[in-house]
Regions:
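Conserved N-terminal entry element of GNAT/NAT acetyltransferase domains
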Residues: 3-9, 26, 30-57, 200-202
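Conserved GNAT acetyl-CoA-binding A-motif
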Residues: 151-163
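Short, solvent-exposed amphipathic helices
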Residues: 1-12, 16-23, 27, 68, ...
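Conserved beta-strand-loop-alpha-helix junction that forms the acyl-donor binding cleft
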Residues: 135, 160-170, 187-191
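Acetyl-CoA-dependent GNAT
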Residues: 46-49, 53-126, 131-133, 144-146, ...
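Conserved active-site tyrosine of GNAT-family acetyltransferases
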Residues: 174, 179
């Protein structure tokens, strides 16, 4: 009876119901409904995200966000404090840049582009941190895009970064942006177990 009723409906419509259901199943197999909902929410929330250049008023935010994520897994190292306590002197005055992500007007993420004194690498992408309550909105990726765009403005050729494979969302973002893992690893931090590079294309 159900089959007959469905066939009657199919005859009364322009599209074959079973074909439509099959197409839905194919699309959902490629990407789940939950994933589609998350992506739609992320796109909607991006309207409330803005990246601005660093100002001294964000010094405490720059430090606190970085301390927060580092101490979740590791300890703060002296090399960290050089940059976190003195961002103007150690990053900006040396030719680098810091970016601050605002969500609904509040600072929730930071990222630095540090000028490198290196024969191969022009800048290091570093100090990327997003407040836990603001994670999942694509803010980290947006900050990375801002840093890469600035590097392009500065005619940089290759970017460098150091991270840890425990930070799976961050590693996924870096790979999505085109960063490739380096075969040799000479970490500047104890927590560093992966180094990557991005060859910028114009």
């Amino acid at each position: 009876d159900v089959e007959v009723a469905v066939e009657d409906i199919s005859k009364e419509t322009r599209h074959d119901l079973w074909s439509a259901i099959g197409e839905w199943e194919d699309r959902l197999a490629e990407k789940s409904l939950l994933q589609r909902v998350k992506e739609a929410r992320k796109m909607r929330e991006r309207e409330h995200i803005r990246v601005i250049p660093y100002e001294p008023c964000y010094k405490n935010t720059f430090k606190s966000l970085n301390v927060q994520w580092i101490t979740q897994h590791w300890k703060i190292e002296p090399h960290d404090l050089d940059y976190l306590d003195h961002p103007q002197e150690y990053i900006i005055n040396k030719g680098g840049f810091i970016f601050v992500a605002l969500y609904r007007g509040k600072p929730v993420g930071v990222c630095a582009l540090c000028k490198m004194d290196d024969p191969v690498y022009d800048y290091e992408l570093a100090k990327l941190a997003v407040h836990p309550h603001a994670q999942g909105k694509g803010i980290g990726e947006i900050l990375c895009h801002a840093a890469i765009d600035k590097a392009k403005d500065m005619k940089a050729k290759i970017l460098f970064l150091e991270s840890n494979t425990l930070l799976k969302p961050a590693i996924h973002t870096y790979k999505k942006l085109g960063f490739k893992e380096l075969a040799e690893n000479h970490p500047a931090y104890e927590r560093g177990n992966i180094q990557m590079e991005l060859k910028i294309t114009y």
